[in-house]
Amino acid sequence: IYETDYRFAQPPRMPTLTAESKDGSIVLTWGNVSESSRDPFLPEDLQYDFEGYKIYRSTDKYLKDAQIITDGYGNPMFYEPIFQCDKVDGITGFSDVTVFGTSYYLGSDTGVKHHFIDADVINGKTYYYALVAYDYGLSPTDEIATGIPPSENNAIIELDENEYVISTGPNVAQVYAKAPSAGYVSSTFEIDDNKLNIG
């Protein structure tokens, strides 16, 4: 059954990304819906295979300036994250399964977080953020000799014929970085371990 069904292995449930623009930074937050995902096409003891989150950032609607990691043939394939966190479970480094000569990076046991503050932004520019949840795939087995590479959520940005953004997936945020208006009192935020409190 694995030989016929493995190709339908699916990424974790898509998280919802929330973004707030501040002066010189953008605060990104999300929930934990992805972490209880079950992949029914994997062996029963491996079905809860969520591993972590990555955030990709681009100033391009097609996310092209983030797609800089190439495959073994030199073709753009993977996006370079500006943030990554993963479960503390001993699953670290690169996946055992390669795709066109390239392995997916699974993390370094940092611990799962639900926020990120991007302080490397310029006021007056628009940024596109994609938050993806990913799993650890499946190492080669007797049933699946090639194994299953890790998978992550898609980042969907829908454009009209004039290339204006008309919609995005729940895990994508389009944010205009701007300085606060005169007299504006910014909300405060504090970080306590994995919690981000905004007031």
Per-region residue spans from a language model:
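Extracellular/surface-associated beta-sandwich interaction domains
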Residues: 1-199
